[in-house]
């Protein structure tokens, strides 16, 4: 099954159709393969869960072997926000694809993010009109609190 973002896909260990999906968003300069290590640990505890680990949409400017959700280098806060909105749209589309292709409700989808992946996961999930189950964030932050406060559409659980 292909998606708009190149992805590492770990199918349910139960071999059945997925009942849930976890989308894992890597950090700045990483890729889906890096963060798929978590999925390989978690799959035994969540046997009916599909794990999808996309590569961010841009080649990383600092580490061309990896990817970035948006550029962080030498920009104003407004430029960073503008670029993050592009990544947000791509991740939002990706979430919709995972839902549609696997016949899952949004309430059965979780986002996990590390570092920059946490930033884009929080921004996307809180602004998404169709509420997902939750966001689990590691070592991240809210990118632009003013923008986010003005655009919250849903309130998934956040861990």
Residue ranges and their predicted role:
Residues 130-142:
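A conserved short beta-strand
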Residues 120-124, 146:
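Hydrolases whose catalytic domains are alpha/beta-hydrolase-1, hotdog thioesterase
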Residues 37, 123-127:
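Active-site signature of alpha/beta-hydrolase-fold catalytic machinery across serine-
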Residues 4-104, 108:
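Serine-hydrolase catalytic machinery in alpha/beta-hydrolase-like enzymes
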Residues 112-117, 121:
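Gly/Ala-rich beta-loop-alpha elbow adjacent to hydrolase catalytic centers
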Residues 54-55, 112, 136-139:
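Alpha/beta-hydrolase-fold catalytic nucleophile elbow
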Residues 13-14, 140-159:
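The feature captures the conserved acid-bearing segment of alpha/beta-hydrolase catalytic domains
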């Amino acid at each position: 099954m292909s998606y708009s973002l190149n992805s590492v896909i770990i199918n349910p260990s139960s071999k059945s159709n997925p009942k849930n999906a976890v989308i894992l968003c890597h950090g700045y300069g990483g890729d889906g393969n890096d963060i798929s290590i978590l999925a390989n640990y978690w799959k035994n505890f969540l046997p009916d869960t599909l794990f999808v680990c996309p590569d961010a949409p841009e080649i990383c400017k600092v580490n061309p072997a990896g990817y970035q959700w948006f550029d962080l280098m030498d920009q104003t806060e407004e430029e960073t926000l503008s670029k993050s909105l592009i990544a947000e749209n791509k991740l939002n589309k990706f979430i919709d694809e995972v839902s549609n292709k696997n016949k899952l409700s949004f309430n059965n989808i979780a986002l996990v993010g590390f570092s920059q992946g946490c930033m884009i996961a929080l921004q996307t999930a809180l602004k998404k009109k169709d509420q997902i189950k939750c966001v689990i964030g590691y070592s991240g932050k809210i990118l632009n609190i003013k923008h986010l406060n003005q655009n919250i559409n849903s309130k998934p659980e956040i861990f």
